Amino acid sequence: MNKKIGILTSTQSFGDNYGAVLQAYALSTCIRELGCDPNIIRYKVEGEYVNHSAPIVKRLQSTLFNPNMSLHGKKTLVMNKVLRRSVSPVFSDFTKKYLQFYNEEYLTNTQLKDNPPPFDAFVTGSDQVWNPVIHGNKNDPGYFLDFVPEGINRIAYAPSMGVDKIPENCKSDLKGYLDKFAHLSIREKSGADIIKECCGMDIPVMLDPTMLLNAEQWDKVAVKPQNLPEKYIFCYKFGKSKKMDKTIRQISKEYKLPIVAAPASPEVKFKADYSIGPAEFLGAIKNATLVCADSFHATVFSVIYKTPFFIFPRHSETGKINMNSRMQNILEMLSLS
């Protein structure tokens, strides 16, 4: 009988985040190729969970008045989840077709501890599961697999901290979490540096799961979006950079290339195509003349498909929130910086 592996990853982003879904698909595929049975655990921390079937007013109220959520978390959910209902169906179609989920859903770490899933081993990662900014400037014990019973292997495969530094309150309990892992790795050198400084541990930097599959393997799920122009700029933008907007428009005008945009943030000033799901996201990047993005996974798939790309920083280097290290690390790793 194949060993059953539980995967803890950013399932709260599966309704609208291409990278979150595609890295989960890649990790599941690689685990399956090892002869194991991957099962994604639906873990949505209280305060991050959004009931998409609820009326819009109730969803706004439950988000805005949640005392357990940081201001950044509230803004992210309102902008990227609550208001973008039309995106979810194309994502749910993909996840139903390609991902295998454990039948229980956990809304809190306490629920995980009280009723842990019965797997032979657990993997946390990839994606930004160790990013304290996302979790209200604190570590989320669930993503450090603290609920796993003694004697069962805990594995961290390329989780991302997503930042160059973590709050002081996150440093004190980090070593206690990491000491319990049978196998450790991290996605960015910046994360490895943080762990070295805080815990005195040297852990390897590993590729994001999406980079473990080649273009031919991704072609098995990639779909070219309908009605695409023959040549176009594919834009995937989270940040607010007006300079990025201006640059993309200049390139579009100079080379007479229309802009095709995937939905990321409603603040983006380009018309988004809401029919683009994870499969179409791959197809849009593969067939683009140029990709312009401030996204880690847009960078990765541009590299995989050898599509010319222009990557922009998402945040100011001096800003309160700075997650640019993810793009910087991957470009340095590939000698493209």
Predicted regions and their residues:
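Aromatic- and Gly/Pro-rich donor/ligand-binding loops
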Residues: 5-18, 22-176
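An anion/phosphate-binding loop that grips the pyrophosphate of nucleotide cofactors and donors
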Residues: 119, 181, 288
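Active-site donor-nucleotide binding/catalytic segment of nucleotide-sugar enzymes
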Residues: 120-171, 205-272, 278
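A conserved, positively charged/aromatic
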Residues: 175-179, 285
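A short beta-strand/loop micro-motif in the catalytic core of glycosyltransferases
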Residues: 181-188, 292
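Helix-loop-beta element that forms the nucleotide-linked donor phosphate-binding surface
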Residues: 192-210
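Acidic donor-binding loop of glycosyltransferase active sites
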Residues: 286-292
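Catalytic binding pocket for nucleotide-activated donors in carbohydrate/polymer assembly enzymes
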Residues: 300-337
